[in-house]
Amino acid sequence: MVNQPSFNPNANRSNRGGRLRNRAVVDTFEPGSTMKPITVSSAMQLGVVDAKSRIKTTRKGLLKVGSNTIKDPKTYGELDLAGVLRKSSNVGAATIALQMKSEEYWRMLDSFGFGLSTGVGFPGESSGHLPNYSRWAEIEKATLAFGYGLSVSALQLAQAYSVIAADGIKRPVTLLKSSQPLDQQRILDHDIARDVREMMEAVVSTEGTAPLAAIAGYRVAGKTGTVKKVGKDGYTDKRYRALFAGIAPASNPRLVLVTVFEEPKGDVYYGGQVAGPVFADVMGHALQLMNIAPDSDVPRPPLHLTAMGGTQ
């Protein structure tokens, strides 16, 4: 776990506030579109959709939920589940979520570990917040699908992605190597986890939102997130959080990594543009340090390439 800016233990005057927190464990945030693979896999596990399902997003990129409107940046037409993730369609994700019964959807999110301590034992760990389904209106269920209305830590998000990486098995988070067998719980069917992981590879393609998260020679599965932050008058268009959560190698997962940027400056603030390249750099070095064999010759996109399709 790495936090920047960090602190210098020899310079006490500069060691204040946020510099002293392990943000990956203590801080929580709305995860945005990084929740979409969790939504898709939950719906598949509940039998609401399957790998061949098609989702209609044809109403001019708009979905009315009561008096509220959910929007996509453009009209994507009919999408398969991989397309919902590749284009990062809010309308598609919300449409899927609204097909699930609230209690069943909540139980799936709970089983992934949202709203619960990971049990890592780090001082000050936050359990985040997952509202109980009994308080959901339809719009709350819809926005949970694309990561608004709950709060998570980076460690919780990594643990949830580790379920997809581990073919549907949830294992406890630990900072210590143990020779004892770890408790484990099956959350997703083996085939569902593999199908979703394959769908997530499309996000890192040139047609997805994160081609800059690609790593030469390795298959990568992941999801971007670009989250509007809350200001004094509600969500603002001036302050963002950029995220990328990913798994590598997607063919035989060994590592999960979550990168989070608070309020990137300038006009470049999308998760695929800001967090994606950092993921590729850190994960690429980690794969080399662990001597993990490449999948094949998968070239990295040119550095000037920007996200195509959706941008969330």
Predicted regions: what they are:
Residues 287-312:
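Gram-negative outer-membrane assembly/targeting C-terminal domains
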Residues 264, 269-285:
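Amphipathic oligomerization regions
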Residues 1-33, 38-263, 271, 303-312:
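Beta-lactam-recognizing serine transpeptidase/beta-lactamase-like catalytic domain environment
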